[in-house]
Structure formats: structure tokens, C-alpha cells
């Protein structure tokens, strides 16, 4: 930009002087060439400086990653002990950084087959609870056990295979419908895959595709709606039949009809399993055995929907505000 302005200024001033007879056109041409020759290295230098600044910023991120504490060595315990889904949090403390503790002295016991709903404002500490359960993060203090076994004594991979997840952003990979459903159980038969899809209300949808269950899905899952993607992930969880489920905002971005299908599929999925449901839409978790109201990393209220509404506290205000907004 600076070089272009210099070129224009030289051309205008030189042209005026040439018309007045002060200099010749050859002199003007020579000055224009000089301006180009001077501007080019200045422009290149600015590009180099910009590239260096980007490289320095990238290097800072790389070295910050290298300076991170290494993941603790994997344990050699037996995760097959996880059969009931009895979960206990004892004096759990956690923070993303040492300077800021997010969860303070959390104590919680979840019995087998119970549905636990976790609600609260955005950024209040709902998702970290299940992330800690699956050991995506390590505790700063306290312990978490499943069926009496401390999760730090179990291999991470084996632990996570025994916890089914249905997330808000349904994740499918490149492969067929059947391969996506069987992701957690590669040895599953076609009959088992179809049975899981039927229970998850996505059998009809799968059969109407051009190649049925053998229809390939691309990375962008063209032609598959968000609701159907979530139904496929529910079918995947049904096929693995885990003792514990984590359901994170699974109906927050679908239409009403699809939401009804997802709710039916989830009801079947949660039968006989310990379930942790993270939701902002409080109407979907009124039947939960236990509702945890989390704010700033602490459980400020706990109880059933009826108990919490009777207390007329933070949960009741959240619940009423949603229906007033609707």
C-alpha cells in the first residue's frame, strides 16, 4: 500500500513538472523505477516480520504444550468389575489451572440404575463432572470409584469402553451406517446392529437410504440430519450396552418430532443403567431420580424435581424462567 501511494505521488508530481518543462519524461520514468525498487524490499520486509510474529505465537503454543505435565501412566486394573454402575465421588476437587479451583469438595453417591440430571448455568461446572468420571482430566484431590473400584486403578481405555456417551454434537466417521453403529463392538452381527437401530428408532431411516445399512457416510454426513445422527449414536450406545451412560444435551438442536423419537430411544437406552444427563432444557429431566444443580463448581441444590420446586430456590427459578421465555 505504501509503495502504491509513493508510485502515484511520483507519477502525479513528475507528470506536472514534465508538462511545465522542468524535467523530461525520461526523468519521471527513472524516478518511477526507483520508487518500485525501494518499495519492493520494504514490502518483503513487512511480510517477513508478519511471518516471524506468527511463528513466534505458534512456537509459544507448542512450547506450552510441551511444558504440560505428562499423563499419568495407565493402570493395569481389571475394568470388567464395572457391571452395576454404582458411582461415588468422595471429596473431589478439580480446577483447569492451579490458580482457580472449579469443583470444591464434591461428595456424591449414585446408585445403580439411577438417572442423575446435572443442570445449571453455562460454565457452572456441569460437564467437568462427567469428564472426571471418564478420566479426561485427573483429580486435584479426592477420589471417584465405580462399583467399589477407584477409577485411577483402571486402564483409561477399558474404563471408557464401559461408559456410553450420546453428545450434543453427534460424532460419525467415514464408513457405512452399520460400521458407525458397530463402532463400539466390532464383533457385532448384522442382526445385533439392526436390533440396536430398531430400538433407537433409526431402523426405518437406515433402510430408506440408497444402500440401506451399507450406505456410506462421508465426513460431512451429507443427507443425514442432526436428529438422525443422534439416533445413530444412541444405537451405537445400545449395542455396546454399557453399565453407565453420559447424555449431554442430546435433544437441544432438533425439531419437536425428532425430539420425541430421541426421548423414546433414550428411555429404552437408560433402562437398567446408571445415567448422567446434562441438560439446559429442564422439561426433559423432570423424571430424574436425582437432580444436581451446579453453580460455580459446587452443588448448590439436590433432590427430585418435585422437591426442588417445593424449595423455591435456584432450580425453581431456572425452571420457571424457561417456561416464561417459551
Model-derived regions, located:
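An intracellular "coupling" helix at the cytosolic face of ABC transporter transmembrane type-1 domains
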Residues: 1-5, 51-54, 71, 93-98
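A hydrophobic transmembrane-helix motif
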Residues: 1-29, 52
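Cytosolic ends of transmembrane helices, especially the final helix of ABC transmembrane type-1 domains
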Residues: 7, 37-65
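Transmembrane alpha-helix boundary and packing residues in multipass membrane permease domains
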Residues: 12-16, 60, 249
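Extended, low-aromatic, Leu/Ala- and acidic/polar-enriched alpha-helical coiled-coil segments
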Residues: 29-32, 123
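Conserved catalytic core of two-component sensor histidine kinases
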Residues: 32, 39, 160
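Conserved E/DxxT/N motif and adjacent residues on the DHp alpha2 helix
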Residues: 64, 71, 182
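ABC-type nucleotide-binding domain
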Residues: 74, 80-326
Amino acid at each position: 500500500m505504501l509503495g502504491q501511494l509513493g508510485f502515484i505521488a511520483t507519477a502525479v508530481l513528475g507528470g506536472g513538472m514534465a508538462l511545465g518543462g522542468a524535467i523530461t519524461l525520461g526523468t519521471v520514468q527513472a524516478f518511477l523505477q526507483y520508487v518500485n525498487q525501494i518499495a519492493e524490499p520494504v514490502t518483503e520486509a513487512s511480510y517477513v516480520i508478519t511471518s516471524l510474529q506468527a511463528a513466534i505465537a505458534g512456537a509459544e503454543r507448542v512450547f506450552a504444550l510441551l511444558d504440560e505435565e505428562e499423563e499419568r501412566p495407565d493402570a493395569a486394573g481389571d475394568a470388567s468389575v464395572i457391571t452395576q454402575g454404582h458411582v461415588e465421588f468422595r471429596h473431589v476437587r478439580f480446577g483447569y489451572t492451579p490458580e482457580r479451583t472449579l469443583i470444591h469438595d464434591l461428595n456424591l453417591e449414585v446408585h445403580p440404575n439411577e438417572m442423575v440430571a446435572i443442570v445449571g448455568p453455562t460454565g457452572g461446572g456441569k460437564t467437568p463432572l462427567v469428564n472426571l468420571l471418564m478420566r479426561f482430566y485427573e483429580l486435584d484431590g479426592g477420589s471417584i470409584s465405580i462399583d467399589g473400584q477407584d477409577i485411577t486403578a483402571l486402564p483409561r481405555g477399558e474404563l471408557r469402553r464401559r461408559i456410553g456417551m450420546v453428545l450434543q454434537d453427534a460424532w460419525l466417521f467415514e464408513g457405512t451406517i452399520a460400521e458407525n453403529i458397530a463402532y463400539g463392538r466390532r464383533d457385532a452381527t448384522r442382526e445385533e446392529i439392526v436390533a440396536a437401530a430398531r430400538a433407537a428408532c433409526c431402523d426405518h431411516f437406515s433402510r430408506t437410504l440408497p444402500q440401506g445399512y451399507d450406505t456410506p457416510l462421508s465426513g460431512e454426513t451429507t443427507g443425514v440430519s442432526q436428529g438422525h445422527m443422534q439416533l445413530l449414536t444412541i444405537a451405537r450406545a445400545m449395542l455396546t450396552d454399557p453399565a453407565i451412560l453420559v447424555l449431554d444435551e442430546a435433544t437441544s438442536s432438533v425439531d419437536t418430532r425428532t425430539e420425541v423419537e430421541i426421548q423414546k430411544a433414550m428411555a429404552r437406552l437408560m433402562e437398567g443403567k446408571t445415567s448422567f444427563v446434562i441438560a439446559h432444557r429442564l422439561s426433559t429431566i423432570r423424571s430424574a431420580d436425582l437432580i444436581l444443580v451446579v453453580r460455580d463448581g459446587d452443588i448448590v441444590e439436590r433432590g427430585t424435581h418435585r422437591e426442588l420446586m417445593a424449595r423455591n430456590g435456584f432450580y425453581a427459578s431456572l425452571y420457571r424462567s424457561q417456561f416464561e421465555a417459551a
